[in-house]
Amino acid sequence: MDNIHKDYGRTELAIRYSPTLTPDAAWKKLKRWINLNRDLTQELHALGYTSHQRSFTPKMVSRIMFYLGEP
């Protein structure tokens, strides 16, 4: 990914992982992947993530990429 040193909107990041899906479907898929990975979910919560958040910090993006791979 070209820039993990910036905040990513949740849909913006989701589309990078699932570019052929609609933005809503891409976000639902990314959210499902996150929720299925307990270690990732715990790390994101430790970094301050809540389900109502609209963006991911660079540290959160880094952890997502660690567990899910680079989009």
Segments (PLM) and residue ranges:
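Polyanion-binding surface elements
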Residues: 2-21
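Ca2+-coordinating acidic residues in Ca2+-binding motifs
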Residues: 12, 29, 60
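Major-groove DNA-recognition helix of helix-turn-helix-type DNA-binding domains
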Residues: 20-55
